Amino acid sequence: MSKPDVAQVKAFLLQLQDEICRGLELADGAGHFVEDAWRREGGGGGRTRVLRHGAVIEQGGVNFSHVHGDAMPASATAHRPELAGRRFEAMGVSLVIHPHNPYVPTSHANVRFFIAEKEGEEPIWWFGGGFDLTPFYPFEEDVRHWHQLSRDLCQPFGTDIYPEFKSWCDRYFFLKHRDETRGVGGLFFDDLNRWPFADCFAFMQAVGKGYLDAYLPIVERRKALAYGEREREFQLYRRGRYVEFNLVYDRGTLFGLQTGGRTESILMSMPPLARWEYDWQPSAGSPEALLYSDYLKPREWL
């Protein structure tokens, strides 16, 4: 295996954060990201950037973090006892965009790198990440575009990669207590070290760079569509599922809180507004009902 180049990964992630913020600001047309640079007492720090009350984006955050320490947290060593007693570095870019317009889907992306080292032993490293889409209203062409781009960026790495990571995404972003997916999926991968370092890094870069190509055309298509109170209420209700997933299931949230990560940055993914309603059911034949019947379960889109 080729030797991991931590500095190269960090440089890419910082540049990626800049590029994504620039692209989202252009798509929004009015809002700007405000940066909050922070340091972690145990080692490391990051740049949290938040855009609020934009023309398109109600609230969005793009976070870069790089944390390191002398010992792994319990959440990481529970499944990987070989990591115990190793110093570690974890770095990544994660983002969530919550648009105003209910016809524009919420999107999430994350790319990350992890390495654990011990004197006299080979380092243990891997990449993880992916992106996923959470529409509130069903537009099949948007979902097909999202998945087509996902498949295209996986293609150079093998024809089996898209089906594998697409399926992983469907399984990961699943709310067991609701028996529904969080959205329509995309790609999800973790523990990626099956190829030499350079190839694994290239795949992570392709996913990171692919996010804007996947999301911005959908934003452009939907951001000017007229909507009313009914659509807004449904959007806020569905955002409740986003909150449920992030607080109950998301491994990144758990890891961040257990490593003494920065709470404001970890919970940046939360929507600014959400609502719950007891035993709400969609009307038969409505677009909302179609979302439930055809979109909130794993399916082949291509």
Curated annotation (Swiss-Prot):
Pathway: Porphyrin-containing compound metabolism; protoporphyrin-IX biosynthesis; protoporphyrinogen-IX from coproporphyrinogen-III (O2 route): step 1/1. A divalent metal cation binds at residues 98, 108, 147, 177. It is found in: Cytoplasm. Substrate binds at residues 94, 110-112, 260-262. PROSITE patterns: COPROGEN_OXIDASE. InterPro entries: Coprogen_oxidase_aer (IPR001260), Coprogen_oxidase_aer_sf (IPR036406), Coprogen_oxidase_CS (IPR018375). It comes from the Bacteria. It is an enzyme of class 1 (oxidoreductase). Its cofactor is a divalent metal cation. Homodimer. This is Oxygen-dependent coproporphyrinogen-III oxidase. It comes from Aeromonas hydrophila subsp. hydrophila (strain ATCC 7966 / DSM 30187 / BCRC 13018 / CCUG 14551 / JCM 1027 / KCTC 2358 / NCIMB 9240 / NCTC 8049). The gene is hemF.
